[in-house]
UniProtKB/Swiss-Prot annotation:
Presence of keyword Transcription: no
Notes on the domains: Lacks alpha-helical transmembrane segments, suggesting that it resides in the membrane via beta-sheet conformations similar to those predicted for other outer membrane proteins and porin.
Gene Ontology biological-process annotations: mitochondrial genome maintenance; mitochondrion-endoplasmic reticulum membrane tethering; phospholipid transport
GO CC annotations on file: ERMES complex
Family: Belongs to the MDM34 family.
HAMAP family: Mdm34
Protein name: Mitochondrial distribution and morphology protein 34
Membrane topology, as annotated: Multi-pass membrane protein
Length: 518
């Protein structure tokens, strides 16, 4: 059984546009390869004048709404298709895009200007198509038409492009296009035929309504915000003509100017503001104040309303303003508004600041302290201690090169930064050592050699109580201070050695023996 197809009925603009749209969507449906700089467009589509030969080999099922059969198709006509796209001619750009796609950007070098895209236009023309294949057709009034090929129907195809002068590119394009055409007959063409059959053979009213709803929704006016307006998009001629006619309608001296919907004109602005509620208008209506009777251009109240000498009037105006604001607030919210309250005549709570830690005063002369206090007043209160006796860690010095201590002032003796080497007691033995509690045979000595006392104040000595068992290295600072004070009052005058004439530091240095005399 064979059929004769009237091929000329396919030469319609509507079918050509619809087929071009389907092919464009199918060619750009997948992920675009990096070598293509733009989408693929259908530049020319012509079905030709020669119809294909269609032969039915077997009919498996035949009914009023169903059909299943095996057919054979042969085509060697003048159908041609022209595609237009742009290809990327810079290989560095392709390499960089592939690296970014494979998450290897951290090892991809930055080529700067060398990786800028360079696109070239490309036109592909497909003609002289030879098709010979066996397929299976399954038709259903509800599910449409399904077409599947048993073999590869493409025999040959001619590919011409703008790169035919380069033989390598021409051969590469020929192989790639043949591969894509075979995929087209295997996957894309059955999908297109199925959609075409559903468009013309669907008898369900629900599908018709589903297609009609988006078209009706597109007819409704959509709100346009200021952010949706793109200044780079050109205006349509229809909108420009409407704006021009509206502008010319305002260039007149007539009193009857046509109104603009959903807008307020400047000439009618006063009528609009009179009906608009405001604080000034509410004050004028409630209190009948002459001061706000004049037309106001803003919603601000005159300052003379609240700056008058009469407190009762000012209080009355402020209460009215508060009531207007409260009533306006309660229209949109049910919660109580927060107001700032200022209490007049309240006593300030006096908080006595107690110092966290008392600061000990350093021995500064009274003249210097008074001069410093007159120049800069510090908020810090110093603790005044009557007793100025404190101990500093002295520096040991040699006995022969030391200068004599100036003992005119007893206090300078305490704060002197040098001291002679301490002397061992007269009853010392091998058990005595130089270190702190150092014993040769690990026996406690009766008189241990101690280091110089740590700096402490008399107040701390009185407050701090040592409880418990005392260690070997314990120093009784109070006893040392008392002995030191007693020593200061009994220090004799500085004497010199009769033989050498060198001054002696009494209390820390023993005089050397006299020179040997024969």
């Amino acid at each position: 059984m064979s059929f004769k197809v009237n091929w000329n009925t396919l030469e319609t603009d509507s079918l050509r546009e619809w087929t071009s749209q389907l092919l464009t969507d199918a060619l750009n449906s997948g992920k675009r390869p990096p070598i293509l700089a733009s989408d693929i467009q259908i530049k020319d589509l012509n079905f030709g004048k020669v119809a294909p030969d269609f032969e039915i080999l077997d009919i498996g099922e035949l009914d009023s709404d169903r059909f299943r059969g095996i057919f054979k198709i042969n085509y060697s006509g003048d159908f041609h298709l022209t595609l237009h796209t742009r290809v990327q001619a810079n290989p560095l750009t392709i390499y960089q895009e592939n690296s970014n796609a494979s998450d290897a950007a951290f090892v991809t070098p930055n080529f700067l200007l060398a990786s800028d895209p360079f696109a070239l236009p490309l036109d592909l023309k497909l003609s002289d198509i030879r098709i010979s294949g066996i397929g299976i057709i399954v038709f259903s009034r509800l599910k449409g038409l399904t077409l599947v090929f048993r073999n590869d129907p493409l025999d040959s195809i001619k590919v011409t492009s703008t790169f035919d002068t380069v033989q390598v590119l021409a051969k590469f394009l020929q192989n790639q296009i043949e591969t894509q055409i075979r995929d087209l007959f295997r996957e894309t063409l059955p999908t297109l035929i199925h959609r075409l059959s559903l468009k013309y053979l669907s008898s369900d009213d629900s599908s018709f309504l589903d297609d009609l709803r988006p078209q009706l929704a597109a007819l409704h006016e959509e709100t346009v915000s200021l952010m949706d307006i793109d200044p780079d998009v050109p205006y349509s001629p229809e909108n420009l003509s409407r704006v021009s006619a509206l502008f010319k309608s305002r260039e007149t001296l007539r009193l009857a100017v046509p109104k603009i919907r959903h807008s307020v004109q400047r000439c009618r602005l006063e009528k609009f503001t009179k009906t608009q509620p405001s604080l000034v208008r509410c004050l004028h209506d409630n209190l009948n104040l002459d001061l706000v009777a004049a037309p106001q251009h803003t919603n601000e109240i005159p300052v003379e309303l609240v700056s008058g000498a009469d407190f009762s009037k000012t209080n009355h105006v402020l209460r009215e303003i508060s009531s207007i604001q409260a009533s306006n607030y309660y229209r949109s919210s049910s919660s109580r508004p927060k107001r700032r309250v200022i209490k007049l005549g309240s006593k300030k709570s006096s908080v006595k600041s107690t110092p966290s830690a008392e600061t000990l005063a350093s021995p500064i002369p009274s003249e210097m302290s008074s001069a410093t206090a007159s120049e800069h007043v510090s908020p810090t209160k110093y603790y005044q201690n009557d007793s100025h006796i404190s101990l500093y860690h002295p520096k040991p010095r040699q006995a022969d090169g030391a200068a004599a201590l100036q003992l005119a002032n007893p206090q300078s003796y305490l704060y002197h930064n040098v001291s002679s080497t301490p002397q061992l007691p007269s009853n010392s033995s091998l058990l005595a050592g130089i270190g702190l509690g150092n014993n040769y045979f690990n026996f406690a000595s009766q008189s241990q050699i101690s280091t110089s006392p740590i700096r402490r104040s008399s107040q701390e000595l009185e407050d701090k109580k040592v409880t418990g068992k005392k260690s070997i290295n314990h120093l009784d600072i109070a006893q040392l201070n008392s002995k030191l004070n007693a020593t200061l009052h009994t220090i004799p005058d500085v004497k010199s050695h009769p033989g050498t004439g060198r001054k002696l530091d009494t209390g820390f240095e023993m005089p050397p023996p006299p020179p040997y005399q024969v």
